[in-house]
Amino acid sequence: MSVKLDEKDLAILTLIQENSKLTANQIAKKINIPITTVFAKIKRMEEMGIIKQYRAILSPEKLNLSTAAFILAAVSYRAKNEDETPISQRQVAEEIARFPEVQEVHIITGDWDLLVKLRAENVDAVGKFVVDKLRLIKGLDKTLTCMVFETVKESTSLPQTFRKNLLKP
């Protein structure tokens, strides 16, 4: 469901994505509107679910979690014997999502069913996660682990292309 926003809404969203610690007063000054308008627009966008959360972005390297990996996983949809109930992609994805090491789980198309992103202390910790936790999940057929050498871009901000799609006519 798409919503229509005005230029001020989009300016507020852009500023909040860049720095969620900005006060309403700082936002009002930057985009030259009354502070009451900023409060009202933010409240409306929160109620509409456009603004879901405010959070800090932590440095994995400073917290000894500098190793990132992406794991492709295939789900076995058929029960191994007649007594078992088949398991769904979603069930396996939800089980994987419970692990604290896991940052993201996506149900995808193609030869693989799931894409998992995780952070760990080192390559050994990634290996232990895959062998001792991930591969024990019922319904998981096989995995392919891709270690990250270097991250060129990592962002939680939505691209600015949303601007043209959401502007009120």
Tell me the role of every PLM-derived stretch:
Residues 1-169:
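A compositional/biophysical signature of low hydrophobicity enriched in polar/charged and small residues
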